[in-house]
Amino acid sequence: MALVKVKPTSPGRRGMVKVVNADLYKGRPFAGLLEKKSKTAGRNNNGHITTRHIGGGHKQHYRVIDFKRTKDGIPAKVERIEYDPNRTANIALVLYADGERQYIIATKGMAVGDQLMNGSEAPIKSGNCLPIRNIPVGTIMHCVEMLPGKGAQMARTAGAGVVLMAREGVYAQVRLRSGEVRRVHIECRATVGEVGNAEHSLRKIGKAGAMRWRGVRPTVRGVVMNPVDHPHGGGEGKTAAGRHPVSPWGQQTKGKKTRRNKRTTSMIVSRRGKK
């Protein structure tokens, strides 16, 4: 995997940096693990915009990822590493000894032909999935469950990883990349190692059109809109917003806390540090 700086043959390619991985499979994805993915353009079932700056983009299939890894004791072999347009991490197609194929998140250093195992008897090896009670303290993990059997929810993006800090009774403490320390039940599963494709954060898109391919529409400032479109709009010539920054619907947009107290923080040991 390498970063390639593109030659400035046009204004759109000037400054563009691509991530090139010669090991990625160049054929079509495995058809048995594809599902239809419908585009919403950021609208809900009423047709109202619920998420701005979404629309268009290339057609995609959803790759069904096995986030639970519950096929215990059955060895699996990595058949190929693939690109997934739905996430920043690459994915691996694994073939289990019983003939079943599954997609999993590709781990850093994973290669075609690697042998993997799930379950409490699996060795501590990058790519193997075990309950946290069987993983040594200090191990870097990814694809960590928050509730036993629910499937991986934490550390799934490219280059992500959490550190197992300690075990106390039925709970373990893990430190996230943000610095937050959380409690997780020791029966929750996690995969050993870091997520691959860490260079993804170093790429440079280069042009607006490349973001349109990804389904991202332009972001327009409120101060250049008309008063009917945004609270910051209107005025003769260039004018300031005239009030504290708000969203198009009048909600404070800088610094206002929006967290609902209904969602418990009992599993958070220490919050992430200020950046």
Curated annotation (Swiss-Prot):
The keyword RNA-binding applies. Residues 254-263 have a biased composition (Basic residues). It comes from the Bacteria. SUPFAM superfamilies: Nucleic acid-binding proteins (SSF50249), Translation proteins SH3-like domain (SSF50104). PANTHER family: LARGE RIBOSOMAL SUBUNIT PROTEIN UL2M, RIBOSOMAL PROTEIN L2. One of the primary rRNA binding proteins. Required for association of the 30S and 50S subunits to form the 70S ribosome, for tRNA binding and peptide bond formation. It has been suggested to have peptidyltransferase activity; this is somewhat controversial. Makes several contacts with the 16S rRNA in the 70S ribosome. This is Large ribosomal subunit protein uL2. It comes from Herminiimonas arsenicoxydans.
